[in-house]
Amino acid sequence: MTIKLIVGLANPGAEYAATRHNAGAWYVDFLAERLRAPLREEPKFFGYTSRINLEGEDVRLLVPTTFMNLSGKAVAAMASFYRINPDEILVAHDELDLPPGVAKFKLGGGHGGHNGLKDIISKLGNNPNFHRLRIGIGHPGDKNKVVGFVLGKPPVTEQKLIDEAIDEAARCTEVWFKEGLAKATSRLHTFKAQ
């Protein structure tokens, strides 16, 4: 099993670019930059895309330009066009249940209230069995404050921790392709930015 599509979830537009909800896109942007594969807008996939080579594997990158709750439209369009199965997809997203500075890989599961994941599961035929990269953004402590929190910008100290976790997640993604998911998971899950 190998990953053929890496997706970074986000809301489109400059006003959302620096908000916590866009952490998934920050990861894909970082990966694209690290591998010198600039993202370009591709309307038929409703997003920005690129193509990278990891250990001889052809991998597509995607940052949807739809709003978060319509992310599945972009993911399904690309998966269908390139005949990519759900278990060959890695979706990077912001995660309230992990603190800033932590990121974890996960296969399958629910959507945990995340509207981007919810729409992807739905558009993939109610199939939740894709890989996720959960990027910790922390929790406001009160569920009524979640919307304002994810659509807010993290303070500089938290942004630094999130950026370090994204850097490590990108390195661990490369480890995944070189040495397998178990090795990559073990390394990423013991990492915590200070």
UniProtKB/Swiss-Prot annotation:
Top-rank taxon: Bacteria
Keywords per UniProt: Cytoplasm, Hydrolase, RNA-binding, tRNA-binding
Catalytic activity field: an N-acyl-L-alpha-aminoacyl-tRNA + H2O = an N-acyl-L-amino acid + a tRNA + H(+)
Record-marked site positions (Stabilizes the basic form of H active site to accept a proton): D94
SUPFAM superfamilies: Peptidyl-tRNA hydrolase-like
Gene Ontology terms: biological process: protein quality control for misfolded or incompletely synthesized proteins; rescue of stalled ribosome
EC numbers for this chain: 3.1.1.29
Active site residues according to the UniProt entry: H21 (proton acceptor)
Main subcellular location: cytoplasm
Compartments where found: Cytoplasm
Signal peptide positions on this chain: none
Enzyme class: hydrolase
Residues annotated for tRNA binding in this entry: Y16, F67, N69, N115
Key word Cytoplasm present: yes
PANTHER family registered for this protein in UniProt: PEPTIDYL-TRNA HYDROLASE (PTHR17224:SF1)
Quaternary structure annotation from Swiss-Prot or TrEMBL: Monomer.
Family: Belongs to the PTH family.
Protein name: Peptidyl-tRNA hydrolase
Name of the coding gene: pth
